[in-house]
Regions:
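Carbohydrate-recognition loop of C-type lectin domains
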Residues: 193-200
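Extracellular adhesion/carbohydrate-recognition regions
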Residues: 22-131, 170-171, 201-215
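Sec-dependent signal peptide recognition
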Residues: 2-9
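Long, low-complexity intrinsically disordered regions enriched in Pro/Ser/Thr and acidic residues
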Residues: 9, 19-22
């Protein structure tokens, strides 16, 4: 009986010790509406403010599968002023022309390499912080459209350009050319309604760059 009491007491001490050693650890997993800063760190908005970091983008998608590259996407805080997809008529920019592909980064490089894409050049010119921003593909900008209402508050808090519902201000270039019309048209996307529109590539329209995250 004495042995039984001793064993029970020992077990109780282990349980108490285990409880005493329990610690609450902060949740550091990246989440939608986290902030990408100019130092490359992704942090909560409150931490960005308290640490005096400079924001550059807001996380709008977390990768849950292998369909997209990296761990997620962030949207740049500001619009790029209207630019033509191409300043030369009749040029293919060798994008995939696949509206379901998450390949905006590759598409933008193809556009830039052509030497005749003002929109792609404008995006490359903003790389002062080393962030590899690019023009989203149709599939990627659809993800942004789905998260717009969630991230807009944080874009505003960070001093960025809120994604507008104004029908005259909501149209953005994607990096995806129109299949079988690659030399003439690319897809324009409404971030107000989710509508796609075939558009002549020499027309100037806004760009909202995004960034692939690998945090």
């Amino acid at each position: 009986m004495k042995l039984l009491y001793t064993t029970c007491a020992a077990l109780m001490m282990v349980a108490i010790t285990s409880c005493d050693e329990h610690r609450e650890f902060p949740d550091t997993a990246m989440k939608t509406c986290d902030i990408l800063c100019t130092d490359g760190k992704v942090v909560r908005y409150e931490d960005m403010k308290s640490q005096g970091k400079q924001p550059i983008a807001v996380v709008f998608h977390i990768n849950q599968n292998n369909e997209t590259q990296g761990t997620g996407y962030a949207v740049y805080l500001w619009d790029i002023a209207p630019e033509a997809y191409s300043d030369s008529v009749g040029v293919k920019h060798n994008t995939s022309a696949n509206i379901t592909a998450f390949d905006g980064n590759m598409n933008t490089h193809s556009m830039y390499s052509s030497g005749v894409s003002p929109a792609a050049t404008a995006v490359f010119d903003m790389w002062q912080y080393g962030q590899s921003a690019y023009i989203p593909s149709v599939a990627e900008i659809r993800l942004l459209y789905g998260a717009k209402n969630t991230v807009n508050d944080y874009i505003k808090k960070c001093g960025g350009d809120v994604i507008s519902d104004d029908p005259d201000e909501c149209w953005y270039w994607t990096s995806t050319e129109v299949k079988d019309m690659e030399s003439a048209k690319a897809w324009l996307f409404s971030l107000a309604s989710g509508t796609l529109q075939e558009t002549p590539k020499e027309q100037p329209h806004k760009v909202r760059p995004i960034i692939t995250l690998y945090n």
